[in-house]
């Protein structure tokens, strides 16, 4: 084998290996290190400069050379051992980390391991009609065989979408401010608090004062009791007649009570008042109650009571003073006249309001019919708005202009349901078609996901043949004030129905009583040529075009802040 050299100070060290022999043949190479690896190692020291360092005077001294040689031997041995140790350690670590992870020690008997249910079981627990209604950050609308799916933002072009999203978010935030949203976080009562206090139900009108019920102190005895109440939107006071040294901060946002008399403290707390100092609506003030390290908080709601809008049914409470029938017609005068005649057969004196956006106005000779004309083709929902805006009775019955009243069209039954329940709208059926559907909402940051399912939620208490649902057919009785509050979007001009119930979700409580049935006129073509021409024109407006569908999707995305529907 060859030799390899390296410099140490002013000396040259040459390491040679060749079997078990030294290759230099010099006396200095007579000391062997023994066998290592492939053979014995030989070290040769060659003085490079006799005049260098401490060896200048003894450059030829064997004793000094042997000592230095011995040191180098030790260094080489240490180096070899280090390399061997490093290789062994690497193999050991590799074996350790490549081996399976050891099992964690099992908990002691009787100790329950803390864990949540797997997602599959959570889905089963919190699913309704195939939809997982558990709080989560994002939602999605999955289409199925019976129900298609829509992603509403697809109604916009990709270049327009960023600006639309920005405007939509700004309008949504404005809506939230007006509605007092999001609601305040839940108040959590800490354990072992020394206070008694209201957790819900304290309300005050703007600029009014109310007593705060239920305040009490149940802490341990103390030389001096100090209790501090703090508000943020109003001021605090007490009706107790006590010195200012006992109660500080009357009429301020912070009220401090300090006394050594426990009974007096109880009396003062029983008569604490809250005053709204600003004209605000739908606000919640969180009042804190503190003593030493204990803190309790409770809400005070600031809002006006709802002003009622009542309809006088008259001393005899006749049906005509309770119900108005409303309809919208377009290019179907013959259908409208047949429907009106059927109404008069069963309800001769009920007021009927007709909104018409046909080209040619009709002449209707009926003292109980109010007929309103509109610009031609103004639209389906615009006509609905016009009709219900003229209703002056407690209830309004909506019908299509091609319906047919019969002996099973019992308006009184629907009135009885609304009078005895909290429903806002109750539908019947059209020739047995109930068309009940449920709307389920999942909320997320980018907009809610709307799920539509056919059917109903539950039976209606007190009316075994009726149910609670989200939407019904175009034959329904409704509280006039509620219907006017939700309204019909006039931008929906042609094909629209479910959109009204989507707008009313969260406002309208809807039911269905299929036993109340209205008929439908024949769909067979008419013989009269003029009427046939009108029907042909009507059908061109009736069709749902791709442009109209895209418009409705965009409307749901922006107006209703929906993300998708399925």
Swiss-Prot record:
The chain crosses the membrane at residues 68-88. It catalyses: an N-acetyl-alpha-neuraminyl-(2->3)-beta-D-galactosyl derivative + UDP-N-acetyl-alpha-D-galactosamine = an N-acetyl-beta-D-galactosaminyl-(1->4)-[N-acetyl-alpha-neuraminyl-(2->3)]-beta-D-galactosyl derivative + UDP + H(+); a 3-O-{alpha-Neu5Ac-(2->3)-beta-D-Gal-(1->3)-[alpha-Neu5Ac-(2->6)]-alpha-D-GalNAc}-L-seryl-[protein] + UDP-N-acetyl-alpha-D-galactosamine = a 3-O-{[alpha-Neu5Ac-(2->3)]-beta-D-GalNAc-(1->4)-beta-D-Gal-(1->3)-[alpha-Neu5Ac-(2->6)]-alpha-D-GalNAc}-L-seryl-[protein] + UDP + H(+); a 3-O-{alpha-Neu5Ac-(2->3)-beta-D-Gal-(1->3)-[alpha-Neu5Ac-(2->6)]-alpha-D-GalNAc}-L-threonyl-[protein] + UDP-N-acetyl-alpha-D-galactosamine = a 3-O-{[alpha-Neu5Ac-(2->3)]-beta-D-GalNAc-(1->4)-beta-D-Gal-(1->3)-[alpha-Neu5Ac-(2->6)]-alpha-D-GalNAc}-L-threonyl-[protein] + UDP + H(+); a neolactoside IV(3)-alpha-NeuAc-nLc4Cer + UDP-N-acetyl-alpha-D-galactosamine = a neolactoside IV(4)-GalNAc,IV(3)-alpha-NeuAc-nLc4Cer + UDP + H(+). A motif (Vesicular targeting) lies at residues 9-15. Pathway: Protein modification; protein glycosylation; Glycolipid biosynthesis. One of its GO terms (biological process) is UDP-N-acetylgalactosamine metabolic process. Residues 1-67 are cytoplasmic. One of its GO terms (molecular function) is acetylgalactosaminyltransferase activity. Keywords: Cytoplasmic vesicle, Disulfide bond, Glycosyltransferase, Golgi apparatus, Membrane, Signal-anchor, Transferase, Transmembrane, Transmembrane helix. Coiled coil: none annotated. Its EC number is 2.4.1.-. InterPro entries: Glyco_trans_2-like, GM2_synthase, Nucleotide-diphossugar_trans. Pfam families: Glycos_transf_2. Residues 89-566 are lumenal. One of its GO terms (cellular component) is membrane. Residues 1-22 are annotated as: ER exit and post-Golgi subcellular localization. Widely expressed. Highly expressed in colon and to a lesser extent in kidney, stomach, ileum and rectum. It is linked to Sd(a) polyagglutination syndrome: A condition characterized by red blood cells agglutination upon exposure to almost all human sera, but not to autologous serum or the sera of newborns. The condition becomes apparent during blood typing and cross-matching in the laboratory. SDPS depends on the strength of expression of the Sd(a) antigen on red blood cells. Most people have weak anti-Sd(a) antibodies in their serum, which is usually of no clinical importance, but can result in red cell agglutination if they are transfused with cells showing strong Sd(a) expression. Beta-1,4 N-acetylgalactosaminyltransferase involved in the biosynthesis of Sd(a) histo-blood group antigen. Catalyzes the transfer of N-acetylgalactosamine (GalNAc) group in a beta-1,4-linkage from UDP-GalNAc to the galactose residue of NeuAcalpha2->3Gal-R to form Sd(a) glycan epitope GalNAcbeta1->4(NeuAcalpha2->3)Gal-R. Belongs to the glycosyltransferase 2 family. Homodimer; disulfide-linked. This is Beta-1,4 N-acetylgalactosaminyltransferase 2. The lineage of its organism: Eukaryota, Metazoa, Chordata, Craniata, Vertebrata. The gene is B4GALNT2.
């Amino acid at each position: 084998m060859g030799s390899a050299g390296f410099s140490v100070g002013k000396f040259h060290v040459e390491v040679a290996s060749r079997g078990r022999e030294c290759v230099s043949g010099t006396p200095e190479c007579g000391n062997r290190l023994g066998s290592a690896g492939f053979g014995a190692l030989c070290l040769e020291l060659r003085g490079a400069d006799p005049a260098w360092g401490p060896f200048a005077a003894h450059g030829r001294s064997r004793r000094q050379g042997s000592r230095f040689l011995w040191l180098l031997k030790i260094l080489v041995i240490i180096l070899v051992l280090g390399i061997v140790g490093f290789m062994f350690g690497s193999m050991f670590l590799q074996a350790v980390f490549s081996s399976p992870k050891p099992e964690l020690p099992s908990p002691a008997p009787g100790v329950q391991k803390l864990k949540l249910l797997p997602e599959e079981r959570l889905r089963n627990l919190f699913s309704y009609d195939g939809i997982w209604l558990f709080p989560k950050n994002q939602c999605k609308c999955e289409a199925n065989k019976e129900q298609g799916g829509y992603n509403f933002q697809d109604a916009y072009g990709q270049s327009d979408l960023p600006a639309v999203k920005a405007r939509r978010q700004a309008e949504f935030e404005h809506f939230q401010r007006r509605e007092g949203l999001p609601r305040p976080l839940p108040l959590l009562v800490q354990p072992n608090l020394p206070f008694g206090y209201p957790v819900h139900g304290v309300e005050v009108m703007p600029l009014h004062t109310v007593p705060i019920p239920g305040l009490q102190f149940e802490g341990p005895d103390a030389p001096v009791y100090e209790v501090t109440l703090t508000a943020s939107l109003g001021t605090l006071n007490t009706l107790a007649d006590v010195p200012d040294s006992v109660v500080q901060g009357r009429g301020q946002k912070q009220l401090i009570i300090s006394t050594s008399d426990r009974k007096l403290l109880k009396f003062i707390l029983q008569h604490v008042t809250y005053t709204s100092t600003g004209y605000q609506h739908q606000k919640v003030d969180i009042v804190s109650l503190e003593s030493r390290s204990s803190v309790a908080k409770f809400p005070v709601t600031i809002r006006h009571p709802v002003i009622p809008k009542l309809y006088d049914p008259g001393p005899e409470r006749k049906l005509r003073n309770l119900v108005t029938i409303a309809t919208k017609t377009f290019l179907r005068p013959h259908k409208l006249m047949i429907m009106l005649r059927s109404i008069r057969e069963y309800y001769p004196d009920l007021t009927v309001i007709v909104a018409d956006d046909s080209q040619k106005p009709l002449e209707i000779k009926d003292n109980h019919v109010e007929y309103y004309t509109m610009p031609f083709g103004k639209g389906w929902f615009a006509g609905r708005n016009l009709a219900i805006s003229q209703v002056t009775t407690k209830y309004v019955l909506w019908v299509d202009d091609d319906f047919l009243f019969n002996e099973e069209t019992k308006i009184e039954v629907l009135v009885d349901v609304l009078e005895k329940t909290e429903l806002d709208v109750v539908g019947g059926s059209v020739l047995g078609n109930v068309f009940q559907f449920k709307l389920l909402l999942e909320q997320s940051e980018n907009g809610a996901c709307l799920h539509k399912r056919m059917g109903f939620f539950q039976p209606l208490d007190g009316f075994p043949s009726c149910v609670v649902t989200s939407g019904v057919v175009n034959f329904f009785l409704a509280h006039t004030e509620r219907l006017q509050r939700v309204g019909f979007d006039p931008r929906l001009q042609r094909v629209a129905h479910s959109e009204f119930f989507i707008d009313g979700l969260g406002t309208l409580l809807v039911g269905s009583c299929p036993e109340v049935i209205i008929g439908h006129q024949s769909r067979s073509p008419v013989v009269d040529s003029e009427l046939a021409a009108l029907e042909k024109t009507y059908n061109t407006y009736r069709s749902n075009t791709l442009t109209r569908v895209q418009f409705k999707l965009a409307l749901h995305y922006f107006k209703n802040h929906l993300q998708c529907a399925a």
